[in-house]
Structure formats: C-alpha cells, structure tokens
C-alpha cells in the first residue's frame, strides 16, 4: 500500500487469506500495520462478519477506504440478500464508475459458505479455481502471494480449512516483514 503523496511514508501491512474446503470457509487476516520500517500496530482487526454472520470479508489497503467499501458491501448485501456474487459485482461496478469511489485504495476478499471473491477497484470480481480435491484458496495484501502459495500447497492434504489458513498465514508471516502471526480467523 503506497500513499499518493510523497510527503507521507509508505504504509504496508495486511495479509488476508480465504480457504474453502469440505463445506467450511475460513478467512484469516494478520494484525500488523506498518509505516515504513516501523510497526505501528500489531493487533489490527482486518476481518469482519457481515449479513448477520453469513458473509465474512477481509480487507487490504488504506483502512478508511476499506471501511467505506465494507459499508458499501453491507448495503449491497441488504439490497441482494443471499446473493453474494451479485452484491460483489454491483459493488465493483460502483467502485469502478463512481468518481469518489474510484479513488479508494483497498481490496476486499469476501466469502460465504459456497464462494470466495476477490473484489478490486478496477472492476474485478475474481473467484479462485478449485483444487483437485474441490477446495479453493485466495489471498490479498502484502503477504498474499506467500499465503496463497502455502494455502495451495496444503489444500489437498488431510487438514481442515482453518488448519490450512493458520499454517499458510504462519508461513506468510515468516517470509513477509509486513505480516505478523497475530491472526483474526472467522469461519463459516
């Protein structure tokens, strides 16, 4: 996450991972927020339950921007109850076309019991492909590629979705200096 102004230091942080396996969906997020080389917070909560607990969302990027997007997603979920894909697509459309929203610098990882979506400001609503065993993994944030690789390596092993998420996030925290092991884990 980089600031738009050279007068502010770069903000980094956040690794969010979603794992779906055997009817269980988990989103895990680390707690670290860094400004340049300094950790400014180690216990941030970047994963939230929405829609009466039926949806879980994690965010990466500018915090205020992410909160704005979470609020917009909640409104879309009220407008389209039990239609997560439609709510995400409608949010992405608004995000891309609205003059105010298109300036927001964040990404969302959103899931219900049956699907996981990565939602971006350029209009992307991406659903991860399934593994041979039927599971799925998606990740965003500074350590997202590390968590994604670890999750994909673990998905077909005899582990629960939560165990995979915790192990993959632990691996990401060992590699990415902007990710810590202080996890928030929400399961559906």
Swiss-Prot record:
Allosterically activated by HslU binding. GO terms for biological process: proteolysis involved in protein catabolic process. Disulfide bonds: none annotated. It catalyses: ATP-dependent cleavage of peptide bonds with broad specificity. Keywords: Allosteric enzyme, Cytoplasm, Hydrolase, Metal-binding, Protease, Sodium, Threonine protease. Gene3D superfamilies: Glutamine Phosphoribosylpyrophosphate, subunit 1, domain 1 (3.60.20.10). The keyword Oxidoreductase does not apply. It is found in: Cytoplasm. The active site is at residue 14. This is ATP-dependent protease subunit HslV. The gene is hslV.
